[in-house]
Amino acid sequence: MDNTYNPQEVEEQAQQYWHKKQSFNVTEDLNKEKFYCLSMFPYPSGTLHMGHVRNYTLGDVIARYQRALGKNVLQPIGWDAFGLPAENAAIKNKIPPAEWTRKNIAAMKEQFLRLGNAYDWKREITTCDPEYYRWEQWFFIRLFEKGLVYKKNAVVNWDPVDQTVLANEQVVDGRGWRSGALVERKEISQWFIKITSYADELLSSLDSLDEWPAQVKQMQRNWIGKSIGTEIYFNVNNYPKRLKIYTTRPDTLMGATYLAVATDHPLAKEAASNNKKVQEFLDSCQGIKIAEAELATMEKRGIDTGMTAIHPITGKELPIWVANFVLMQYGSGAVMAVPAHDQRDWEFAQKYQLPVKQVIKPIDIEHDFNQSAYTEEGILINSNQFDNLLSSKAIQVITNFLEENDAGKATINYRLRDWGVSRQRYWGTPIPMIICEQCGIVPVPDEELPVVLPENVDFTGTGSPLTQCKEFVNVTCPKCGQDATRETDTFDTFVESSWYYARFACKGQENAMLDDRAKYWTPVDQYIGGIEHAVMHLLYARFFHKLMRDEGLVNSDEPFKALLTQGMVLKDGHKMSKSLGNVVDPNHLINTYGADTARLFVMFASPPEQSLEWSDSGVEGAHRFLKRVWAFSHQHRDMLIDINDSILSGNGHVDWKEAESRLKKSRHIVHQILAQATHDYDRNQFNTVVSGCMKLFNEISDYSIETENDKFFIHSSISILLRLLAPITPHICHCLWQQLGFDKAIIDAPWPKVDKSALKTDEVDYVVQVNGKLRAQFTASTDATEEELIAAAKEHAHNFVVNHTIKKAIIVPHRQLINLVIG
């Protein structure tokens, strides 16, 4: 055992042991409690950053701790390998996306191995492998057969120069990120999965997720956006279809003074066909994608279409406007405008001098409608037969009236829209459909799956390479045998990440998407990832799990039992980025200090849910602590080995009850720390675990070894310390455990048990406050009376109470606190 801590040698030795023993390969065991720990799998960018180090260390610490508790632990790793960066690299560097991706995976795998994470590598999944996406295609066809998949036209961002669809993040100031061309809003045919069919269950089952952050659940509730309201039908003059609008305030219907539709609403296009000014307005809105969050602050613009609708109760004509604040993707793309009682409608009415009709009278307050809209409930006025009704009653009465006259109905509306899974990109899973002129859309037969993504394609940066690949596109219809074409869209990459966690359980299964192993391992017991995935990946994965459940593939309702959302890693108060020059390279960190130091620092510097501020001095402090643990263990190695030999031979036994006072006190501290650290591990509060380990080490390193019992105490305490640290710093603990003569490998050692008798003590430390301010401390016997405690408190705080009258003495036993109140 070297005197000096050499992290590179230590970590290589530990990793070789784990690799040789296949320490983390796991199989199903019905006799043990299972624990499935999973961190969101990474996109293979080629290099790990400190955010990766923190995220995956968190998962590894949890997995190792649960294993120490005796559970059957699965912790797999894989690669979310499809996506836009690979295509961009192909265009820029003239390298096939597959080759670029494989190189990046190899580089990142090497970095993961250096971190020492306890992964079952035999379950490694790469989503761009046909053996993986074959079953995604198979499942999509099952959903199509159930009527849960359909194709319809939808508006997308279109780059007219590159002839391709752009993701929202590829549109910069209204222009294509690569070509610089003005982006157009274009309607093309897209594939959708009916997530709205599961909206109610996705919403209600959030209540069962007790171990999810409340913030994430609320974000999903808001995204699903369930609301109870009324659908109202307006007949349109010289137009064949009724205009449907949705509102939660039908009590304001009598105050509607105009209607407004989205710029891409069919009625807007109809109006533009006969009105040049309307067409010019629509053209001016092309390429402007408005986020919902921007609606409150954006300039509201519109134009009168010249068309009119009929009010369903009064029969009066209402002008129909096209407005940029109405979004086609929300509701029906049309709204009834009540300027007196909706602030957005009021602002628009003020700008275009449209009438404002008050129909709700505030109760017991005055309101100036020249200044703003009144948006609360009240008493109806100017509403004909509905006058004098309270808003709450009027909502029901007016809805009933509309239903009786076929002019509307009560309905439940969701903000959530069906999931558009089409991408007009190359590097993704091919959608397994064939388009035949005679038969329409025909699924690829199961026996022809997977539809393999061809690699012999040309990347010009213009259009989708798949559309130019004749060998891929031109096929025979499996239904009629005539010439047909293959679907050239690929799946949104969120599809791959919506079910990968279940496939980890069944890696190697060639005859089915999932098998009974998925039912054993799912749901994931602990999932770890960023909160930025709250309403995309996490919602889609919940949806997919319910789809798989209904197909009989899994037997649980939710995919992830517990969710931990870690904070970001910051440096100088900012997120690490190359542009800011504040990036810390994990490779350099590991080369300099070792993986254990990196792991210890990221666990100690902050609670997992909070942002972590990088600190070079903090890293050095973590390294110094490990060096001290190593040096102490080396200093006492021979003694510890001798004690181990005694214990293994059955001769080592100490009656702790008969030990001297100072030993009992130190042992009490050690077991207090053990109890608290175990509690903190259970709550994922690893920063306080590390703090406890440092206190424990200080206690034993300062302890004077004088008797045989003292030696056994140090042996017991170092055994506890190493096991407490092992999930966080596994390499150094592995080597020290072996070199100090402990039985088995530390990864197979049971979690240390708290000796409850050690938690009992003959003495208690008290603090004394005088008028609420800390003034003294003292130690007293556990059986001291109240009178004795108060007398001791007065004695130790003598300088602060002399010449004062003590009005009251308050003892707070559970806090070991005595407060003296003086006059």
Swiss-Prot record:
TM spans (from-to) = none
The EC number of this protein is 6.1.1.4
Recorded hits in CDD domains, A to Z, give: Anticodon_Ia_Leu_BEm (cd07958), LeuRS_core (cd00812)
Which InterPro entries does this one have? aa-tRNA-synth_I_CS, aa-tRNA-synth_Ia, Leu-tRNA-ligase, Leu_tRNA-synth_edit, M/V/L/I-tRNA-synth_anticd-bd, Methionyl/Leucyl_tRNA_Synth, Rossmann-like_a/b/a_fold, tRNAsynth_Ia_anticodon-bd
Primary site of residence: cytoplasm
State any GO BP term from the record.
leucyl-tRNA aminoacylation
The compartments listed are: Cytoplasm
Q: Which UniProt keywords apply?
A: Aminoacyl-tRNA synthetase, ATP-binding, Cytoplasm, Ligase, Nucleotide-binding, Protein biosynthesis
Per the record, what is one GO cellular component?
A: cytosol
In which residues does the motif 'HIGH' region occur? Answer: 42-52
Per UniProt, ATP binds at K578
Q: Which Gene3D superfamilies match?
A: 3.10.20.590, HUPs, Isoleucyl-tRNA Synthetase, Domain 1
Q: State the reactions this protein catalyses.
A: tRNA(Leu) + L-leucine + ATP = L-leucyl-tRNA(Leu) + AMP + diphosphate
Write out the GO MF terms. Answer: aminoacyl-tRNA deacylase activity; ATP binding; leucine-tRNA ligase activity
HAMAP family in the record: Leu_tRNA_synth_B (MF_00049_B)
What PANTHER family does the record tag this protein with?
Answer: LEUCINE--TRNA LIGASE, MITOCHONDRIAL, LEUCYL-TRNA SYNTHETASE
Q: What family is this protein classified in?
A: Belongs to the class-I aminoacyl-tRNA synthetase family.
Entry-linked NCBIfam families: leuS_bact
Q: Spell out the protein name for this chain.
A: Leucine--tRNA ligase
